[in-house]
Design a protein with these regions (language model features):
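Active-site and NAD+-binding cores of ADP-ribose-processing enzymes
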Residues: 1-121, 133, 156-312
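Conserved structured core elements
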Residues: 143-147, 261
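Short active-site loop/helix that positions an aromatic residue
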Residues: 146-156
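A short, exposed loop/beta-hairpin motif centered on an aromatic-Gly-Thr core
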Residues: 122-143
Length: 312
C-alpha cells in the first residue's frame, strides 16, 4: 500500500501544471495557454527564437517541464524513420515553363521559401518530407505518401508538381529527432489502461514480497518507489502527446500562417536548442501520412526517378 501511495503522490507531482487525470479540463487549459502563447508572439512580446522570454509563457514552461522528464521516450534516430520500411517523399511545385527538374530542384532554397512553414519562417532551408509505411500494392495511381506530400503543398487543380523519393545520408542516420506522433494510433482509454496494468503488476509484486517477508518474520524492505517512475512518465508523455495532437496540431488556413505557425516555430527552436536534428509530426491534412522536418537539409537526399504530376 505504501508503494501505491507513493505512485499516487508521484503522479500528482508530475501533473502539477496540467491535471492529466481530468482530460476535459486539461484540453481546455492546453488550448487556452496555446492561444496565449500565440498571441504573445503576434504582439511581438518576444521573437520566435527568443527562448529566454518564451520560456516564461505558461505553455512553453509546461512543455519544458514535461520534456525534461520524458524526452527519451520521444527520441528516434533519423535512420529509424528514413528506412526501407517507410516510403519517404518530397513534392515540389513547378512551373510549366521549367525544364525537366533535377535533384537540386527538389531541395529547399531560401529564395524560393516565401511563406511560413509549420516549424520554420520564410527563407529557412529546413527539409520537410512526408512518409508512410511502404505499400506493396498502392490502391491508386499515387501512393499514400505521395498523396500526403501533395496535400501538404495544398495542391490545387491545374498545378504541376515533381515527386521524388528521399533517403537518409548515412552520416546523419544516428542523429536524434523528436517524435510527436507516439500516441497517434492510441486512444486515451488505451493509454490509461496500460498505466493501470503496469502499476497493478508492480503493486502485486510488492505485496507478494511483503507477504513473504512477513511469513519469514523478517522486516520488509522499503518499497521501491523508482519502479513507478517509468510507467508514470510514459503515461504522461503519451497523454501529453495525444493532447497536443488533438488540440494543437490542426490544419491552418494560408491567410494566417505567420500568426498560427509562430508558436510551432518557437517549439522547433526549443527542440533545436536541445541538440536534436528534427521533428516528426502527424499530417493535419492527410491523416494516413506523417511528416518529418530536418533542421539540416543535407540529412537526406533525393533518390530514384522524379515523377511529374499534373493536378486535375
Amino acid at each position: 500500500m505504501l508503494a501505491y501511495k507513493s505512485y499516487v503522490r508521484r503522479r500528482k507531482e508530475m501533473c502539477s501544471y496540467y491535471d492529466f487525470t481530468g482530460r476535459e479540463k486539461t484540453e481546455a487549459t492546453i488550448v487556452k495557454t496555446w492561444a496565449e502563447f500565440r498571441q504573445d508572439l503576434a504582439n511581438h512580446k518576444f521573437a520566435y527564437n527568443d527562448l529566454e522570454r518564451a520560456l516564461h509563457t505558461t505553455f512553453l514552461h509546461v512543455f519544458d517541464d514535461v520534456f525534461q522528464n520524458g524526452h527519451t521516450l520521444l527520441e528516434k534516430r533519423i535512420g529509424d524513420i528514413l528506412n526501407a520500411e517507410n516510403h519517404v517523399v518530397r513534392a515540389a511545385r513547378i512551373n510549366p515553363s521549367e525544364s525537366a527538374p533535377n535533384y537540386e530542384r527538389l531541395m529547399p532554397k531560401s529564395e524560393c521559401i516565401k511563406e511560413d512553414n509549420r516549424f520554420s519562417p520564410p527563407r529557412v532551408e529546413w527539409l520537410y518530407l512526408a512518409f508512410a509505411s511502404r505499400e506493396k500494392f498502392p490502391t491508386g495511381s499515387l501512393s499514400t505518401v505521395e498523396q500526403c506530400a501533395l496535400k501538404e503543398c495544398r495542391a490545387v487543380s491545374g498545378e504541376h508538381f515533381a515527386l521524388c523519393d528521399f533517403k537518409a545520408n548515412e552520416k546523419f542516420a544516428n542523429d536524434l529527432v523528436i517524435d510527436l506522433t507516439i500516441a497517434k494510433n492510441t486512444s486515451f482509454d488505451e493509454i490509461n489502461a496500460l498505466l493501470e496494468a503496469r502499476t497493478s503488476q508492480i503493486e502485486e509484486e510488492e505485496t507478494r514480497k511483503a507477504v513473504i517477508y512477513y511469513l519469514e518474520k523478517r522486516r520488509p524492505p522499503v518499497a521501491n518507489k523508482e519502479r513507478y517512475n517509468f510507467p508514470l512518465t510514459d503515461w504522461v508523455m503519451h497523454t501529453y502527446a495525444k493532447l497536443l495532437a488533438d488540440q494543437i496540431f490542426l490544419p491552418v488556413d494560408s491567410a494566417d500562417k505567420s500568426v498560427m505557425y509562430a508558436p510551432f516555430q518557437c517549439m522547433a527552436q526549443y527542440i533545436l536548442s536541445k541538440g536534436y536534428s528534427g521533428i516528426v509530426y502527424a499530417s493535419t491534412v492527410y491523416p494516413a501520412g506523417n511528416n518529418i522536418v530536418l533542421f539540416d537539409k543535407t540529412a537526406a537526399h533525393p533518390c530514384g526517378k522524379i515523377h511529374l504530376i499534373d493536378i486535375s
